[in-house]
């Protein structure tokens, strides 16, 4: 089998959810539903974890341990999410 065909086959087999261009961490929930996403949304362990489920009924989502802003993950929990005209959402952090 040519190298290109092998590479394409591997890329088709790997789930695209492993790759997150938005900067957040893609995580997999348990097989019984979105248990991990629900756990992270409970804001346990003194963090402000937020999860965005990609599609309803899916166990895949982007979870951020600070603050979600659109599809981005802000660097700190004190940051606020703002919308810039023509540039989209962005994080505004004090100091």
From Swiss-Prot:
Assigned protein family: Belongs to the conotoxin D superfamily.
Maturation-removed propeptide residues: 25-45
Domain of life: Eukaryota
GO cellular component terms given for this protein: extracellular region; host cell postsynaptic membrane
Cystine bridges: 64-73, 69-81, 74-91, 79-93
Subunit annotation: Hetero-, homo- or pseudo-homodimer (identical sequence, different post-translational modifications).
Full protein name: Alpha-conotoxin-like Cp20.5
Keyword annotations: Acetylcholine receptor inhibiting toxin, Disulfide bond, Gamma-carboxyglutamic acid, Hydroxylation, Ion channel impairing toxin, Neurotoxin, Postsynaptic neurotoxin, Secreted, Signal, Toxin
Subcellular location: Secreted
Keyword Lipoprotein: no
GO molecular function per UniProt: acetylcholine receptor inhibitor activity; ion channel regulator activity; toxin activity
Originating species: Conus capitaneus (Captain cone)
Tissues with expression: Expressed by the venom duct.
Recorded domain comment: The cysteine framework is XX (C-CC-C-CC-C-C-C-C).
Function: Alpha-conotoxins act on postsynaptic membranes, they bind to the nicotinic acetylcholine receptors (nAChR) and thus inhibit them. Through its two C-terminal domains, this homodimeric protein would bind to two nAChR allosteric sites, located outside the nAChR C-loop of the principal binding face and at the adjacent binding interface in a clockwise direction. This toxin specifically blocks mammalian neuronal nAChR of the alpha-7/CHRNA7, alpha-3-beta-2/CHRNA3-CHRNB2 and alpha-4-beta-2/CHRNA4-CHRNB2 subtypes.
């Amino acid at each position: 089998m040519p190298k290109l065909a092998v590479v394409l086959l591997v890329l088709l087999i790997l789930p695209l959810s492993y790759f997150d261009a938005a900067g957040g961490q893609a995580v997999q929930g348990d097989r019984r539903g979105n248990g991990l996403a629900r756990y992270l949304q409970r804001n346990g362990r003194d963090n402000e974890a937020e999860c965005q489920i990609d599609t309803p009924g899916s166990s895949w989502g982007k979870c951020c341990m600070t603050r979600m802003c659109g599809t981005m993950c802000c660097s700190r929990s004190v940051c606020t999410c703002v919308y810039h005209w023509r540039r989209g959402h962005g994080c505004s952090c004090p100091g």
